[in-house]
Amino acid sequence: MNVLPCSINTLKGLYEISGVEVGQHFYWQIGGFQVHAQVLITSWVVMAILLGSATIVVRNPQTIPTDGQNFFEYVLEFIRDLSKTQIGEEYGPWVPFIGTMFLFIFVSNWSGALLPWKIIQLPHGELAAPTNDINTTVALALPTSVAYFYAGLTKKGLGYFGKYIQPTPILLPINILEDFTKPLSLSFRLFGNILADELVVVVLVSLVPSVVPIPVMFLGLFTSGIQALIFATLAAAYIGESMEGHH
């Protein structure tokens, strides 16, 4: 009977799953501050990829665009169209902000699946996509919230706060709560999806041969791109809403 060996193999697989490191962090002590080193390292890598690729492509623009130029122009047009659709005709000043958010999240999400972070050994925890950490997603959501209020105050002045009593003052607490829950929904949605995707891949790799999780990894790449698009779209929509009025 092969029941006993199968049971032993199953228990070994479950033991490996239980060893997946979630919530274990490696810190640097800089002055009087404790810094989350894992997020800083991976974020620096992502920023280096973005800045390096952009510098290489745009430092010597050609009259006849190269493939790299065409790609970056397509990305820029995509971000412009997204901003214009959600914000309206006054989208211009917000293109850099929306574009920065989209590109950083997109490359961060993909880095979790494409870059071999695990070959870098740390005393505690392990490297993963920057967006796999709640600190990163909150840090991305808070500037979005600030931009939301800034856009409304710039466009309408103090009259912007009149939206909180529309259509009736009874809704004042709900309208205030709505604005302060937007950054929470942005941060937790992104964090939850990226963390869940990486955990699913780790679990499947622990239980089944390495070939089987490949379709799941491709699905993860697709959903990672979708999450970046959702974040950028909602950020632009919130800014557009604050400039146009409460819906």
Swiss-Prot record:
One of its GO terms (cellular component) is chloroplast thylakoid membrane. The keyword Cytoplasm does not apply. GO terms for molecular function: proton-transporting ATP synthase activity, rotational mechanism. Pfam families: ATP-synt_A. The chain crosses the membrane at residues 38-58, 95-115, 134-154, 199-219, 220-240. Its main location: plastid. It is a multi-pass membrane protein. Keywords: ATP synthesis, CF(0), Chloroplast, Hydrogen ion transport, Ion transport, Membrane, Plastid, Thylakoid, Transmembrane, Transmembrane helix, Transport. SUPFAM superfamilies: F1F0 ATP synthase subunit A. PROSITE patterns: ATPASE_A. NCBIfam families: ATP_synt_6_or_A. This is ATP synthase subunit a, chloroplastic. It comes from Nandina domestica.
